[in-house]
Design a protein with these regions (language model features):
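Class I S-adenosyl-L-methionine-dependent methyltransferase module
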Residues: 98-231
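Conserved class I S-adenosyl-L-methionine
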Residues: 77-88
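N-terminal, positively charged/glycine-rich alpha-helical extensions of SAM-dependent methyltransferases
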Residues: 2, 9, 14-47, 186
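Acidic/glycine-enriched edge-of-secondary-structure segments
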Residues: 50-56, 86, 207-215
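Class I SAM-dependent methyltransferase Rossmann-like catalytic core
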Residues: 33-77
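Glycine-rich SAM-binding Motif I of class I
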Residues: 89-94
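Local beta-strand N-terminus motif with an aromatic residue
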Residues: 78-79, 231-233
Length: 233
């Protein structure tokens, strides 16, 4: 079953049990349940989702449909703000950023996204180097927070907020290869540690173990972007 958010992007529905009733289970089932609880990761029916988005031109078609909206945008000082939740693998967002650059090549961009899937975050980061070459004055933010928390970049869970992982990546160099190497290094060193998922004990839905925010921008643009770079709260 496919559902659509306000931008029309397809999302595979995430099915998970909310409650396991007390009953006799085979030893094999008990082992499986214990393994799932200990080694839970967010896949969101990932095989079907990836098969769909990689074998169709859906995201390109949606980006084309959004062009009239982009052309009507009027940014307000100090930047054009773009919010994408959830980001997915970033394919659609990158197309939108290209369109915005064509219309506003000299306006600073503050792009804020949320994505709970570590795999999608990795794929999204891999697409970023070219964006920082074409549009230098960009601040890109990724969080694993809930939808209602993602604009404030702050967890509503007081206990979890104390464990906030706030990572700032200042890209150095002047080529997409330089930026790509730095982001790949960040992926290897930090991403798997700070993007862990668990089940919400009340709803059974996937949620973050620890709130995490990644802020990315070019080091040589820090002075001009100072007013729009988010600060840890």
């Amino acid at each position: 079953m496919w559902t659509y958010d306000v931008t029309g992007r397809s999302r595979s529905s995430f099915k998970c049990f909310k409650k396991i009733y007390k009953k006799k289970l085979s030893s094999r089932k008990l082992k499986i349940l214990k393994f799932m609880k200990k080694n839970f990761r967010f896949f969101d029916n990932r095989q079907k989702y990836l098969l769909f988005v990689t074998t169709t031109n859906e995201k390109n078609m949606i980006a084309d449909a959004l062009k009239p909206i982009v052309h009507k945008l009027t940014p307000k000082f100090p930047s054009l703000k773009i919010f994408d939740a959830g980001m997915g693998d970033g394919s659609l967002l990158m197309n939108i950023m290209r369109q915005c650059h064509q219309k506003m090549p000299h306006i600073p961009f503050l792009v804020s996204t949320k994505e709970i899937s570590m795999e999608d975050v990795r794929l999204g980061l891999e697409k970023l180097p070219d964006r920082f070459i074409e549009h230098k004055n960009t601040v890109f933010v990724i969080s694993n927070l809930n939808y209602t928390e993602s604009t404030s970049l702050k967890s509503n869970n007081f206990t979890k907020q104390k464990k906030m992982n706030w990572k700032v990546v200042k890209l150095r160099g002047n080529s997409s290869l330089d930026f790509s190497n730095q982001l790949r290094k960040f992926n290897r060193k930090f991403l798997s540690k700070i993007w862990q998922i668990e089940r919400n004990p009340k709803t059974g839905n996937p949620t973050y173990k620890e709130p995490s925010v990644i802020v990315i921008y070019r080091k040589d643009q820090e002075f001009t972007l100072k007013n729009i770079i988010p600060k840890k709260k």
